[in-house]
Amino acid sequence: MKNVDFCTFGVKLGMTQILDNFGNLVPVTIVSQPKPCVITRVTTSLNSQQKLIIQIGCYSDFRANKPTIGYFKKQSVPNLRYLHEFQTYKNNEYQVGKSLDLKELDQQLVQVSAYTIGKGFAGYQKKHKFSRGAMSHGSKSHRRPGSIGAGTTPGRVFPGVKMAGRLGFSRRSIKNLLVLKVDLTNKLFLLKGSVPGKYGNLLLVSLKKTNYFLD
């Protein structure tokens, strides 16, 4: 649970390019906000400062079990599928059941967290960029892994040896992405650069305390 100024969910719609004030092409990612709302609001005291623990959620969930349904019913909010909890010192901006306003992100540097594209089971060359063997006639070790350790001593394979396996679908975060534009009517905003994952991927966009407005 991190201490941030603002946090919301987003959905990656795709990438395009726009022109800045100097006529340069800037690659941007179009992100939509899936109407997240505040679920819980708990006030704690730390170093004589009032700190809020906020829980937000998005997307309706019809498969929730009874304890979860009871939890949402107690908070007077609909059943939500994706939840996230964060801490903030802004006491008056988060009310239970209210949606989050995107104007907080305009011209700010944000951190985006998401899952990368899953590529399935991959070999040594694709996953770890290993060099392959000779491709000439007579060679039998084109893409084989080779040795993975010694023999009798130590008689085992050490943990952490790079081998073939699943590639992708890892949680990754990118810091200091600039929010170029915010469309409050359509709940869209433009991020400079790329973000992890495929189109339609759920993103977690957070605004840190160290960020500042850019002129």
Curated annotation (Swiss-Prot):
Pfam families: Ribosomal_L3
GO molecular function: rRNA binding; structural constituent of ribosome
SUPFAM superfamilies: Translation proteins (SSF50447)
UniProt-annotated stretches for the region Disordered: 132-151
Protein's UniProt keywords contain Cytoplasm: no
InterPro entries, alphabetized: Ribosomal_uL3 (IPR000597), Ribosomal_uL3_bac/org-type (IPR019927), Transl_B-barrel_sf (IPR009000)
Location of this chain's protein in the cell: Plastid, Chloroplast
Domain of life: Eukaryota
GO annotation terms (biological process): translation
Stored NCBIfam families: L3_bact
Assembly with partners or alone: Part of the 50S ribosomal subunit.
Job description of the protein: One of the primary rRNA binding proteins, it binds directly near the 3'-end of the 23S rRNA, where it nucleates assembly of the 50S subunit.
Record protein name field: Large ribosomal subunit protein uL3c
Recorded name of the encoding gene: rpl3
